[in-house]
Structure formats: C-alpha cells, structure tokens
Amino acid sequence: MFDGIMPLIGSLLLVICVMVGVAFLTLLERKVLGYIQIRKGPNKVGFNGLLQPFSDAVKLFTKEQTYPLLSNYISYYFSPVFSLFLSLLIWMCIPYLIKLYSFNLGVLFFLCCTSLGVYTVMIAGWSSNSNYALLGGLRAVAQTISYEVSLALILLSFIFLVGNYNFLSFYFYQDYVWFIFFCFPLGLVWLASCLAETNRTPFDFAEGESELVSGFNVEYSSGGFALIFLAEYSSILFMSMLFVVIFLGSDIYSFMFFLKLSFISFIFIWVRGTLPRFRYDKLMYLAWKSFLPLSLNYLFFFVGLKIFFISLLF
C-alpha cells in the first residue's frame, strides 16, 4: 500500500512544483524583457509584481471559451490537454534518487514523449479548421521533426560514452569533468535545437505574427490557450534542466544545480529579447546541412573513442 501511494504523492508534488515553476518563469521572462527594453515590467500585483502570474491565470481561465463553428470539436478541445499532459509526463524521467519511478530507459522515454508532442501541435492546427492555424501547425511539425534528429544523435553519442540510458549515470559520469568542456560545439547545437524544439525565438515560425497571426493556437481562447502556454513553458524548463544534467553535470539535490538551471532558463529569455526571427528556409538548412553532419561526426568520434579505450583494456 505504502509503496503504491508514495510514487503517486511524489508525482503529484512534482506536477505542482513544475506548475509553480512555470508561473514564475513567465514572470521572470516579463521582467527580463522589460529590463532589456528599458522599462520596469510587471510591478503592481502583489509585492514587486510577484502575484502577476496567478492573476494572469485567473484572468485567462475566467474568460469565455469560444467554439469555432467549423472546428472538429473533440480533437480541438483535447489537443491542449494532451499537450500539457505530455509535457508533464516528460518530467518523470528526472534522475531522482528517491522512490518516485525508476527509469533505466529515461533517454528513450524523453525521445518518445517529445516525438508525441508533434501530434498535439498538428491536431491543434488541423482541428481548428483555419488556414492560418493549419499553416502554423505544419511549420511547427516540420521544424520539430527536423531538430529532433540532431537531439537524438547528440544523446546517442553521449550514450555510447556513458553506456547507460539512465539520466542518473550522466551525473555520475561527470564527477571530474563536465561534458561541456570537451563537447562545446555539441552544447551549442543542443541549445539551438532546444530553442527550435520549444518553438522559441529566433525559431518561432509557428507564431510569425506578420504572416500567421498567432500560429496553430490562433483559434484558442481562455483555458485552451492557457494550457498550450503552460505546456510550452514547462518544456522550456525541462529542456533547460536536461542541458544542465547532460552538459553541466551536477547533483540534482545541490543548490548549484538550480543555479545552473536558472541561468539556462535566463539564456532562453535573453535570446528572445535580443535576436530577430530567422528565415524559414535557413532554419531547415541549419538543421540538415550544419547540425546533422556535426552531430553525426561527434557520434562517429565517440564510437571510435569507446572502441579505442576497449582495445587498450583488452
């Protein structure tokens, strides 16, 4: 009984903490963008604007839920819910030492969840029955699939080195030296791929205001929009955490881990405040002509390195 209840309580606490983290990430983003644009940002609600995200949530969920006449009702309503469910499910592969869930195949679980995330975007765009939403959805799907290839290859090259699919072994492996020191180009590729994967500036083509209004979520209002928004920011937070686990290997219980996590999240926001939007064809060229060859080369290098070390031992 106790063994059955503890993982449930642990996962519930995790979901609550992620939601609170996402709320304050939006506040951090608005504050940082405010200071980048030489203004204050939110500072009225609560002490220095601390309660702003909660008032935003109340405002969004109390608004009227519109229903486009031509939309496919069930898929239109369930795609944001499924999107949020997937982005919260990915958090289960965090390398916890406590008795939550033991994931020996955490890397594969992460790749499966991110691949499934494509369908929610596609269905959200298609079920709205709006041309703009469909175009935004198609762009987002093409972009996500393109950058998932380089993400998977980078992870595969590290798996060859670490020899395990568990994220916990990444932390044990980097006791003496971080991966970022001898794989710096790979770290930059991973960061750029994360930006593309989460549809962030400079790769936010699903939301090109000048052409597609707001992208695949253009027909969503109040609750549906809030769920898509939560899913996006939850995946940003998770990608930042994954960058820290893979490249800046630190103990998940140390204060330094959360300091690094905050810094990587800040980089996501900083990039949004400073870089203009990329061109769509250049985005695709970047994925297939630059990132793919680089990650493949690193993969071959790591395989060769592993074979070399094994041949030295035996």
Curated annotation (Swiss-Prot):
Its main location: mitochondrion. It is found in: Mitochondrion inner membrane. It comes from the Eukaryota. Its EC number is 7.1.1.2. The chain crosses the membrane at residues 5-25, 78-98, 105-125, 152-172, 176-196, 227-247, 251-271, 294-314. Keywords: Electron transport, Membrane, Mitochondrion, Mitochondrion inner membrane, NAD, Respiratory chain, Translocase, Transmembrane, Transmembrane helix, Transport, Ubiquinone. One of its GO terms (cellular component) is mitochondrial inner membrane. It is a multi-pass membrane protein. It catalyses: a ubiquinone + NADH + 5 H(+)(in) = a ubiquinol + NAD(+) + 4 H(+)(out). GO terms for biological process: aerobic respiration. GO terms for molecular function: NADH dehydrogenase (ubiquinone) activity. Belongs to the complex I subunit 1 family. Core subunit of the mitochondrial membrane respiratory chain NADH dehydrogenase (Complex I) that is believed to belong to the minimal assembly required for catalysis. Complex I functions in the transfer of electrons from NADH to the respiratory chain. The immediate electron acceptor for the enzyme is believed to be ubiquinone. This is NADH-ubiquinone oxidoreductase chain 1.
